[in-house]
Amino acid sequence: MAKEKHLTSLDFTASHSGSITRRNSMLTVLGSALALAGCGGGGGAVVAGAGGGAAGGATSALTVGQITGFGSIILNGNGVRIDDSSASISDDDGNDLRGRLRLGMCVAVVTASNGAGNSVAAQSIISSGELQGRIVGTPNTAQNTFVVMGQTVKVVGATVFDTSLPNGFASLATDTIVEVHGQLNANTNVLKASFIEKKTAPAFFKIQGFVSNHNASTRKFNIGPILINYANATELRLTPANGLLVRVRLTAVLPPLALPAEWLATRVRGPEHLAENRGAFEIEGGVTSFTSSALFSVNGVPVDASTAVFERGTAASIALGVRVEVKGSLVNGMLIATRVKLEDDNELDEREFELHGSVANLTATTFTLRGVTVEYGAATLYRRGTVTNLVNGAQVEVKGVATTGTGAATRILATRISFES
């Protein structure tokens, strides 16, 4: 049996009174406030420019993806350093996150760009996780997985654990409340984690996934095994429909034991509300809906790849769940792709991180850089200096990977240290 096509908010969807057209659905999306978030899409607050107005327009650039470096901020392992010193930095509710961004977090970054689309200083950065809730059952140490509200989460080599989980995977236990950043694979329905943080008494839970068993009369639907009631949702930015990728905020109260147990939704949004044209747009993620190799979506963002150049593969390789990096421009809510690069999941599972800054708290085996603990040793390579130049205050560039073992993901193992002037 062919796998069900997942929908984006630009596909035909059902309203309470019947069907609405693709055109009307697009107008609904474009009429919404610009809501952007990280690796797996997600709702958000209005993106504000550095001057306080709405950032955007055809001369601005937008990059959506994972934080892979600091000094200033680096996304998706591309090595481009974006100056965040004057940017507004917040979560998707507008709460200030300055000084609280972490490696592995999923973000949307708006920058200025010239006619060629070359980014300069960031105007705004919005971070948002894909899942927040209580761990159910015992985490599976053999498979490196755990379950939150029916959603299976996979921990990989590049998963970063916040210091609130000091023993990495071993810190996870039944009933621990966590926020997870990552990418949902539309083919396997597994959320591959890029960052995990422990939460204490959060005001709400949240989940992102594909709608199934939608009942417009009772205003209920499923995401995976959980039943969601949105009858009293105070913010409903789209009409739920089977196959649609949605982001739902839930009350942080466990459903009653009596079946069918229902989670109560307070907000339902699409993964991306793209209200402004962008001269340059870049997104890394999984294919979440597929019509053809020329028309698909990435993390809920519709992509027209009819004239794109494909790298590290061909157009025939595009399928549901495949990881890609897409570059182009955003026109009327559609990403007009100029380049589509197919990505290897295994490579990304061991992705390299990059840090720039001043060495602090130096010991014989570790130091701190940009708030991150870095391990170094005999296997570390050096450029423009040697280990004797590694002193507190030294300006360095570090490239490395998340370490393995207890507390591994809270540290970076340096594979190369370069001394900077």
Question: Which positions does each model-derived feature cover?
Answer:
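N-terminal secretory signal peptides
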Residues: 1-38
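Short, conserved catalytic or interaction motifs in soluble domains
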Residues: 41
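Solvent-exposed hydroxyl-ligand-binding patches built from regularly spaced Ser/Thr
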Residues: 44-421
